[in-house]
């Protein structure tokens, strides 16, 4: 008998059926097939899905960032989401752990993530997963390229 009712898989290919399932279970920001296929075709990108037989219950998007200094590479855990109905069941922690395992496979020196301090769930998850809150005064700027 499995330990959990969910599993985590790295997605290397996306077809219409998977896209429809993702967009059904996570309708807030619908994915576009061509963009999703480009994302997963790049070996420096990671897409993890946590699934039950009926639901995509968690998603990770991460990127390998090559360094020019003494560090070999870093992994940016760009996005992690767990469906509210299944939070606090270890899915978020397992997704962070799977991302860290991928980073180790790549030889990355560390993995990092940004979040708002007001996001109590994320702060608790990252602490529980062994993350260190080591940059207290960070600002993020966005530049439009259009």
Please give the residue ranges for each predicted region:
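Conserved acetyl-CoA pyrophosphate-binding loop and the N-cap/start of the following alpha-helix
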Residues: 86, 90-98
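Residue-level recognition of the GNAT/N-acetyltransferase active site
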Residues: 83, 116
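Conserved active-site alpha-helix within GNAT-family acetyltransferase domains
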Residues: 93, 105, 109, 117-136
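Acetyl-CoA-dependent GNAT
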Residues: 3-72, 78, 96-97
């Amino acid at each position: 008998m499995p330990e959990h009712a969910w599993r985590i898989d790295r997605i290397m290919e996306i077809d219409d059926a998977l896209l429809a399932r993702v967009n059904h279970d996570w309708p807030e920001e619908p994915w576009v097939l061509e963009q999703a296929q480009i994302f997963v075709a790049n070996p420096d990108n990671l897409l993890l899905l946590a699934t039950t037989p009926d639901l995509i219950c968690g998603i990770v998007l991460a990127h390998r960032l090559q360094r020019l200094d003494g560090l070999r590479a870093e992994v940016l855990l760009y996005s992690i989401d767990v469906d509210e109905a299944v939070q606090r069941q270890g899915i978020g922690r397992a997704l962070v752990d799977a991302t860290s395992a991928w980073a180790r496979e790549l030889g990355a020196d560390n993995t990092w993530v940004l979040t708002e301090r007001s996001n109590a769930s994320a702060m608790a998850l990252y602490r529980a997963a062994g993350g260190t809150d080591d940059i207290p005064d960070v600002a993020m700027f966005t530049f439009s390229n259009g």
